[in-house]
């Protein structure tokens, strides 16, 4: 990952390849130091691979000035010789690093030196600066470890324990941030005075550096360089016996050679952080997979799945646990990491192959163990602490529940002592197939969907049918004896049925049998006998002739004159069958029109010919009837309005009294009674005035 351009210093591990221009150390100091190191069993062998490297071909050559043999104190040399023989296998590994782009510091004059990422500064080192050679034995390591522990509290803001590179797992990967602990191999820097320099009075390992220069190379394009390691190169670089050196720049540009990292102490921390990150990643993947599988796919809920759940909770060992254990036992390269991630992805998204396993179970018997393994893994993954099994059982889909109930019922019926009976099924080609109901029909996995559907749809049936000879199913329709249901199975694509087969169930009458079913078309077809059609036509003609013989009919009741008191009259100019009407029928019609609230003109006008009615009816005055009805309507309206006014007045009085605060219930009741009496007296006066007129 790319580091942020902020306060976190970066350390760039440099391994010069063949393409980079390397330069042998020249001068008496370098040769004498090389000779002294080669004489000590090649403890600090300065080969051309691990000496200074330039960033580009056009850059200035990197010529580091090493110490001369005379400048190294005799005590340090003797101590190093004795310690080196004892601790030859524990030689530290140092890498050339460059602290880049850091601008942190609590005080104004303190902090890390800001060094350009593209080039190194080429400057003279002050006389007060010193270069400490930090690989003279375990006593010097112990003293520096004590110094690190003292200064952990003051530089805790620059620490990042959890950072690790995602590309390299060996000790020489490119680290973007500066770790703080000694096991990580870096040295924290506080202020202008380097905190990693040892005092001359306590260690006597400081070396004069009057004429030393910091090697640097400045490119015209200011392009930074970084060394990219492959996993094998990094592994060989870690196991190599050649030590590297790390340069740390502080505010006063004091170069210090220190022990950069120790692989044996660094490995447990890095592996623990890697395992923790992988464990959280696997946990997230398993949660996503289980949630998506429980949401989008219906589980196969049966007795087998219940047993599988109990077995998987006891005996199932997750491959992820085995993978994490194997990675804890030894170091892993980047190829192992990529293989582990591929395995994690296949485990996390195995729910995508879950439905494939279930469908292959219904198509082929040989794939049943693989489908059971998928079911075990999904059940073991779903039994996490974040979603309990009881809650998932309550959220079982409806169709899965129905399928489970059908299987339970079919298993109970198959175990019961029921004699085998023959059922009659009809294929779509109208050929009758006789099937024997076997008690062990549930043993075949291909017949599970049909058995469950038939037993759930026909609850009163005896047993479940079985497919004939395991061939193609063109579609079956049949009836279970002793039941009122008829089911039909659609044709399947293969020799067996899938889980999502839809079975059609019809309710049939009690007196239905197979022969009636065959004669359905004959009975449903209408009879086209010409003799019956002729008889119908003759009866219709006779009715028409009878109507003609009856003569005139009333246009309201469609009957002839029955008595002399109810004769047929011609009220208007209508002709034909609408010409005549009974007197009583006409009176009823006119009365209905008056009661409906029609006007006098509308009552005395014919609705068909729009002519005025010419009526001479006994005891029937249209004008008088219309006026009486109008008076009644006015009285009704007056009473309705009066009652409305009384109620409105009462409400207004009550609200007024409430507002004035003088609400007295007896007085209000008396006033209401007086108002009602006044209204009744007014109504009596109106009635007397109408009688006078």
From Swiss-Prot:
Keyword terms of this UniProt record: Acetylation, Cytoplasm, Metal-binding, Phosphoprotein, Transferase, Ubl conjugation pathway, Zinc, Zinc-finger
Residues the record lists as N-acetylmethionine modifications: 1
Superkingdom of this protein's organism: Eukaryota
Biased amino acid composition, Basic and acidic residues: 268-279, 517-533
Name assigned to this protein: E3 ubiquitin-protein ligase MARCHF7
Domain notes: The RING-CH-type zinc finger domain is required for E3 ligase activity.
Task performed by this protein: E3 ubiquitin-protein ligase which may specifically enhance the E2 activity of HIP2. E3 ubiquitin ligases accept ubiquitin from an E2 ubiquitin-conjugating enzyme in the form of a thioester and then directly transfer the ubiquitin to targeted substrates. May be involved in T-cell proliferation by regulating LIF secretion. May play a role in lysosome homeostasis. Promotes 'Lys-6', 'Lys-11' and 'Lys-63'-linked mixed polyubiquitination on ATG14 leading to the inhibition of autophagy by impairing the interaction between ATG14 and STX7.
Upper lineage: Eukaryota, Metazoa, Chordata, Craniata, Vertebrata
Tissue-specific expression: Expressed in brain, thymus, muscle and kidney.
Ranges annotated as biased composition (Polar residues): 14-36, 95-105, 112-132, 167-184, 192-215, 236-267, 306-323
SUPFAM superfamilies hit by this protein: RING/U-box
UniProt keyword Zinc-finger present: yes
Annotated InterPro entries: RING-CH-type_E3_ubiq-ligase, Znf_RING-CH, Znf_RING/FYVE/PHD
Region (Disordered): 1-43, 69-136, 158-281, 296-342, 361-430, 445-475, 512-533
GO biological process entries: negative regulation of cilium assembly; negative regulation of DNA damage response, signal transduction by p53 class mediator; negative regulation of intrinsic apoptotic signaling pathway in response to DNA damage by p53 class mediator; negative regulation of proteasomal protein catabolic process; negative regulation of protein autoubiquitination; negative regulation of T cell proliferation; positive regulation of cell population proliferation; positive regulation of protein polyubiquitination
Species of the source: Mus musculus
Reactions this protein catalyses: S-ubiquitinyl-[E2 ubiquitin-conjugating enzyme]-L-cysteine + [acceptor protein]-L-lysine = [E2 ubiquitin-conjugating enzyme]-L-cysteine + N(6)-ubiquitinyl-[acceptor protein]-L-lysine
Pathway this chain belongs to: Protein modification; protein ubiquitination
Disulfide bonds: none
Location of the protein in the cell: Cytoplasm
Signal sequence segment: none
Annotated zinc fingers (RING-CH-type), start-end: 546-616
Main location: cytoplasm
């Amino acid at each position: 990952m790319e580091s942020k351009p902020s306060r976190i210093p970066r350390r760039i591990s440099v391994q010069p390849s063949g393409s980079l221009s390397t330069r042998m150390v020249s001068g008496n100091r370098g040769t004498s130091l090389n000779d002294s190191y080669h004489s000590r069993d090649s403890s600090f062998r300065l080969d051309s691979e691990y000496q200074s490297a330039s960033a580009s071909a056009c850059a200035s050559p990197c010529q580091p000035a090493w110490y001369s043999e005379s400048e190294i104190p005799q005590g340090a040399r003797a101590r190093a010789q004795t310690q080196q023989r004892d601790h030859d296998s524990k030689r530290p590994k140092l890498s050339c690093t460059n602290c880049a782009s850091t601008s942190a510091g609590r005080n104004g004059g303190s902090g890390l030196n800001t060094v350009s990422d593209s080039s190194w500064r080429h400057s003279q080192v002050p006389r007060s600066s010193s270069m400490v050679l930090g690989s003279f034995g375990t006593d010097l390591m112990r003293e520096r470890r004590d110094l690190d522990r003292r200064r952990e509290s003051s530089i805790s803001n620059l620490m990042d324990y959890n950072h690790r590179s995602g590309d390299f797992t060996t000790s020489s990967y490119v680290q973007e941030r500066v770790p703080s602990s000694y096991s990580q191999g870096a040295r924290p820097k506080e202020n202008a005075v380097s905190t990693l320099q040892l005092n001359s009075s306590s260690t006597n390992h400081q070396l004069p550096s009057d004429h030393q220069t910091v090697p640097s190379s400045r490119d015209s394009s200011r392009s930074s360089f970084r060394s990219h390691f492959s996993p094998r190169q990094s592994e060989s670089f870690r196991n190599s016996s050649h030590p590297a050196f790390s340069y740390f720049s502080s505010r006063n540009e004091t170069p210090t050679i220190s022990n950069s990292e120790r692989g044996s102490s660094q490995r447990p921390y890095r592996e623990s952080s890697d395992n923790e990150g992988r464990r959280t990643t696997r946990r997230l993947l398993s949660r996503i997979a289980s949630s998506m599988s429980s949401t989008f796919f219906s589980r196969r809920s049966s007795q087998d799945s219940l047993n599988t759940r109990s077995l998987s909770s006891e005996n199932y060992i997750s491959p992820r646990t085995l993978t994490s254990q194997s990675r804890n036992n030894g170091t892993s390269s980047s190829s192992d990491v990529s293989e582990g991630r591929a395995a994690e992805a296949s485990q996390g998204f195995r729910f995508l192959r879950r439905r494939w396993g279930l469908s292959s179970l219904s198509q082929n018997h040989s794939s049943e163990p693989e489908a059971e393994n998928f079911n075990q893994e999904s059940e073991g993954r779903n039994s996490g602490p974040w979603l309990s099994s009881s809650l998932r059982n309550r959220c079982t889909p409806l169709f899965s529940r129905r399928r489970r109930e059908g299987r339970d019922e079919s298993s109970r019926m198959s175990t019961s002592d029921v004699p085998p009976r023959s059922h009659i099924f009809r294929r779509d080609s109208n050929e009758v197939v006789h099937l024997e109901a076997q008690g062990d029909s549930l043993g075949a996995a291909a017949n599970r969907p049909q058995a469950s559907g038939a037993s759930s749809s026909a609850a009163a049936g005896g047993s479940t049918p079985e497919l004939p000879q395991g061939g193609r199913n063109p579609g079956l329709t049949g009836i279970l004896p002793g039941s009122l249901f008829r089911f039909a199975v659609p044709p399947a694509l293969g020799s067996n049925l899938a889980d999502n087969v839809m079975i059609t169930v019809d309710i049939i009458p009690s007196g239905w049998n197979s022969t009636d079913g065959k004669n359905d078309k004959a009975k449903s077809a209408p009879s086209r006998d010409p003799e019956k059609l002729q008889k119908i036509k003759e009866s219709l003609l006779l009715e028409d002739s009878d109507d003609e013989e009856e003569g005139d009919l009333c246009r309201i009741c469609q009957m002839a004159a029955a008595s002399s008191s109810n004769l047929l009259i011609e009220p208007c100019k209508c002709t034909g069958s609408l010409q005549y009407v009974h007197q009583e029928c006409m009176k009823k019609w006119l009365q209905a029109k008056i009661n409906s609230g029609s006007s006098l003109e509308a009552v005395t006008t014919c609705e068909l010919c729009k002519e005025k009615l010419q009526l001479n009816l006994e005891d029937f005055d249209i004008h008088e009837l219309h006026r009486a009805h109008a008076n009644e309507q006015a009285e009704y309206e007056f009473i309705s309005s009066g009652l409305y006014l009384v109620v409105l007045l009462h409400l207004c009085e009550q609200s007024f009294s409430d507002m004035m605060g003088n609400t007295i219930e007896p007085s209000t009741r008396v006033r209401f009674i007086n108002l009602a009496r006044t209204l009744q007296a007014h109504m009596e006066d109106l009635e007397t005035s109408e009688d006078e007129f």
